[in-house]
């Protein structure tokens, strides 16, 4: 066992070329935590007997009970590679010991914000795919996120034991199934890849794909088999690797290689992969599982596997585990693949810097990040907060991109809204301690150089969720993470005992710190609202809130859905509003924006912080906007980055710039709470046509302009055929054929519409994809399991906003009922006000 000390690891941290930061990502239940176990065991942290069952990285009690990962956990491992392997690494390295910082992330779709946080601080990803189920919706989502952050993937095809023992497939079928999976991963990679990253497709013949079983603790790459055979037959290893995959066949009679499936007499030949790689594995499985006592010793001798005396008495699965572990230890295959094919921080930061850093690409900090320079000014990105054993305190978990972080060092803590040169969202504080994250434990260290992943103590009070730490006064922030899911399910939380209210408020603060994608807010009527990405996510958050963060009994309302307000047409007449003192007037019209523009804003392709000329160019070329309009976008709303715009179409108005700030803040206010049901607006574009202002500055202050602009926005909105939008989940359901009927009946009952249904070749499984309104999704999983006898497993992820056709202003329609219910809940008058209420006559 390699029991290593913290000092050894600290000295490795300085050799940045020998560090690998990687995360493990996959679809739910494809076996990430189980696979991670065999790596952890190799590093001597859990015993070999437990690996595969311990799920060491699932540190929380509810994770062990539910058998799912909820939070991403980090651990540092130490590994030695043999000399001849080190020579073949395609990048610089120093010595043959390597430090691997590994983050195990959740696969469940509700927690994909945890995955985003894990990806930000790593450079490579191990994508785990189930042999039987193949590439699923969540595999695609996480892979897309990874490529968006310019992270290089390697693949491990897991659960091969299932294919051998449960499905009893033939060798050729198994090869075809592997090659289909690799093919579909490569399709995703080529769809979302980016030029800077280059070609990152995975090829078994190059050693970037491993095959194995996390539960049994064995895995192999083609490179390992090629090494064995190269020694045995005295041939070149590289040539052997290429021949062990794809259409190459070996004719044992003539001892010749060919790429035809038959020999000269027309007899079928066996594929090299099947013959040299799968055959020994299949033989072992057959001999052991059919209890052929006499064959086993000869096989083991051929494969050079020595059993201890007590292991010789085992039989069946127990013996299989021991033998396969000795024959093809999982950790060796995976560590070799990680070290050889994933980039070191030096290599990766070179091409990731411009995407991580908000400032210009030629400033000193960006260059330091590119070089991963430990002597430069500190640049550290905190991607999430990890709760400590000490109640209410958090470790800041992040990665040093440049410089060195030391305990006791004074640093600048820059929150997400910090702008260089200003004092907003900035704190100057000292780091108390620097620690190494080791699963559920932490180890203190003195300092940590660039390129490593680290935990910090003592700065949690100054950061909400994420932020940039630096010692340079001119540093811009690191770019904010984009989450692929949005919080669309909310509940109102209240205390059972009124004395506990302060505890609840404190608990909500802590909750929003500990989860990157939960929203907590207080509504106008005084309710405390918690919003999550789905039912499961919300359930875990509330359980944490009740037991950990607040520690008091709570009353929880039934879940409700967040809607959006939008318009269908241009305002039927110009909306006019006068200021309270009757001296200023604003004339405007509202109109809908294209869905693709709204999506581009939500995904950050059109960014309020970009240069307005460059942004106008993009909007004109890609979305067909008029260039002068695109240049005159005053602001995005709500929160300064939402999918609603104010466009200035006025001509020659005096004093216009003086009221710009008031108009902008009024628009943020109006779009945050629309006139119909007090929800956020979406895809609304407001064109200001004309403004009449009083000549005296004192009569056109914010107090005069803000209410006017808000009323005008509401009037224009209500004149433009208002509609409401509801969030829609994309549901992917895997099930056997006989259960498909049950799925359709449940979906029809819940206003779902089926998008596609296909059978996975080589398995009895069907995949059904459907759209399901979030409003109908509560209890969907339970009903589905009932209708299909527990054979169907749904995965739901937020997909898009769908406009409801009925009129929200008519209280008898479907939309009208939603509006009435929401207005009651928000404590507003039940009647929706008409546009006349906000419109002023000349």
Swiss-Prot record:
What is the E.C. number? Answer: 3.6.5.-
Question: Mind telling me which PROSITE patterns this protein's record contains?
Answer: G_TR_1 (PS00301), G_TR_2 (PS51722)
Coarse class of the primary localization is: cytoplasm
Q: Which UniProt keywords apply?
A: Cytoplasm, Elongation factor, GTP-binding, Hydrolase, Nucleotide-binding, Protein biosynthesis
Reactions catalysed, as given in the entry: GTP + H2O = GDP + phosphate + H(+)
- Protein function: Catalyzes the GTP-dependent ribosomal translocation step during translation elongation. During this step, the ribosome changes from the pre-translocational (PRE) to the post-translocational (POST) state as the newly formed A-site-bound peptidyl-tRNA and P-site-bound deacylated tRNA move to the P and E sites, respectively. Catalyzes the coordinated movement of the two tRNA molecules, the mRNA and conformational changes in the ribosome.
**Belongs to which family?**
Belongs to the TRAFAC class translation factor GTPase superfamily. Classic translation factor GTPase family. EF-G/EF-2 subfamily.
Q: Which PANTHER family match?
A: EUKARYOTIC TRANSLATION ELONGATION FACTOR 2, TRANSLATION ELONGATION FACTOR-RELATED
Protein name in the entry: Elongation factor 2
Please report the organism this UniProt entry assigns to the protein.
Candida glabrata (strain ATCC 2001 / BCRC 20586 / JCM 3761 / NBRC 0622 / NRRL Y-65 / CBS 138)
């Amino acid at each position: 066992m390699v029991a290593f000390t913290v000092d050894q690891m600290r000295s490795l941290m300085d050799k940045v070329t020998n560090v690998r930061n990687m995360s493990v990502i996959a679809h739910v239940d494809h076996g990430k935590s189980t696979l991670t176990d065999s790596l952890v065991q190799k590093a001597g942290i859990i015993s070999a007997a437990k690996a595969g069952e311990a799920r060491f990285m699932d540190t929380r009690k509810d994770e062990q009970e539910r058998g799912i990962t909820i939070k991403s956990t980090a651990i540092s491992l130490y590994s030695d590679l043999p000399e001849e392997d080190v020579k073949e690494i395609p990048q610089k390295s120093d010595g043959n010991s390597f430090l691997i910082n590994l983050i195990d992330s959740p696969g469940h779709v509700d927690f994909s914000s945890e995955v985003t946080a894990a990806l930000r601080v790593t450079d490579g990803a191990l994508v785990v795919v189930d042999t039987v189920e193949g590439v699923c919706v969540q595999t695609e989502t996480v892979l897309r996120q990874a490529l968006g952050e310019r992270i290089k993937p390697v693949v491990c095809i897991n659960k091969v034991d299932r294919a051998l023992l449960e499905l009893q497939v033939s060798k050729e079928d198994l090869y075809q199934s592997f090659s289909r999976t690799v093919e579909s991963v490569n399709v995703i990679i080529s769809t979302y890849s980016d030029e800077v990253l280059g070609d990152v497709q995975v090829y078994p013949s190059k050693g970037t794909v491993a095959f194995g079983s996390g539960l049994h603790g064995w895995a192999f790459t083609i490179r390992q088999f090629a090494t064995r055979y190269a020694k045995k037959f005295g041939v070149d290893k590289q040539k052997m690797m290429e021949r062990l995959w794809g259409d190459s066949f070996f004719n044992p009679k003539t001892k010749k290689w060919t790429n035809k499936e038959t020999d000269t007499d027309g007899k079928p030949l066996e594929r090299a992969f099947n013959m040299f790689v799968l055959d020994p594995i299949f033989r072992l499985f057959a001999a052991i599982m059919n209890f052929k006592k006499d064959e086993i010793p000869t096989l083991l001798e051929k494969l050079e596997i020595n059993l201890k005396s007590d292991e010789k008495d085992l039989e069946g699965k127990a013996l299989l585990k021991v033998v396969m572990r000795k024959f093809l230890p999982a950790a060796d295959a995976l560590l070799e693949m990680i070290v050889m094919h994933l980039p070191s921080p030096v290599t990766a930061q070179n091409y990731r810097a411009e995407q991580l850093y908000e400032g210009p690409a030629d400033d000193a900090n960006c260059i330091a990040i590119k070089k991963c320079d430990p002597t430069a000014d500190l640049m550290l990105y905190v991607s999430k907060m990890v709760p400590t054993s000490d109640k209410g305190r958090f470790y800041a978990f992040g990665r040093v991109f440049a410089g060195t972080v030391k305990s006791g060092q004074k640093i600048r803590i820059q929150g997400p809204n910090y702008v260089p040169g200003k004092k907003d969202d900035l704190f100057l504080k000292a780091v108390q301690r620097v620690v190494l994250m080791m699963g559920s434990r932490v180890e203190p260290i003195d300092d940590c150089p660039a390129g490593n992943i680290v935990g910090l103590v003592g700065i949690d009070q100054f950061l909400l969720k994420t932020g940039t730490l630096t010692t340079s006064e001119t540093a811009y922030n690191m770019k904010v993470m984009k989450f692929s899911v949005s919080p669309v399910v909310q509940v109102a939380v209240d205390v059972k005992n009124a004395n506990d209210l302060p505890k609840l408020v404190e608990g909500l603060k802590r909750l929003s710190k500990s989860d990157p994608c939960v929203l907590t807010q207080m509504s106008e009527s005084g309710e405390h609202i918690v919003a999550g990405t789905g039912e499961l996510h919300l359930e875990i958050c509330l359980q944490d809130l009740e037991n950990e963060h607040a520690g008091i009994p709570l009353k929880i309302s039934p879940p409700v859905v967040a809607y959006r307000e939008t318009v269908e047409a241009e305002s039927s007449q110009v909306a006019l509003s006068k200021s309270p003192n009757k001296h200023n007037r604003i004339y405007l019209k509202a109109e809908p924006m294209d869905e693709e523009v709204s999506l581009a804003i939500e995904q950050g392709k059109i960014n309020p912080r970009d240069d307005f000329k460059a942004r106008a160019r993009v909007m004109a070329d890609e979305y067909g906007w008029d260039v002068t309009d695109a240049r005159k976008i005053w602001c995005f709303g709500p929160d300064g980055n939402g999918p609603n715009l104010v466009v200035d179409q006025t001509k020659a108005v005096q004093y216009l710039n003086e009221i710009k700030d008031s108009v902008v803040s009024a628009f943020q206010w109006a779009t945050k709470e629309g006139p119909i049901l007090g929800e956020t607006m979406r895809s609304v574009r407001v064109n200001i046509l004309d403004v009449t202002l009083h000549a005296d500055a004192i009569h056109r202050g914010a107090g005069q302009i803000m209410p006017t602009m808000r009323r005008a926005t509401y009037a224009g909105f209500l004149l433009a055929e208002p509609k409401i939008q509801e969030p829609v989940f994309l549901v992917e359901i895997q099930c056997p054929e006989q259960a498909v009927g049950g799925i359709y009946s449940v979906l029809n009952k819940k206003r779902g519409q089926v998008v596609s249904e296909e059978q996975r070749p080589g398995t009895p499984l069907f995949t059904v994809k459907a759209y399901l309104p979030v409003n109908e999704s509560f209890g969907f999983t339970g009903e589905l399991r009932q209708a299909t006898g527990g054979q169907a497993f749904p995965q739901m992820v937020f997909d898009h906003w769908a406009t409801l056709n009925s009129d929200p202003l008519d209280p008898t329609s479907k939309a009208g009922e939603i509006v009435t219910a929401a207005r009651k809940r928000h404590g507003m008058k039940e009647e929706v006000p008409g546009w006349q209420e906000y419109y002023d006559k000349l």
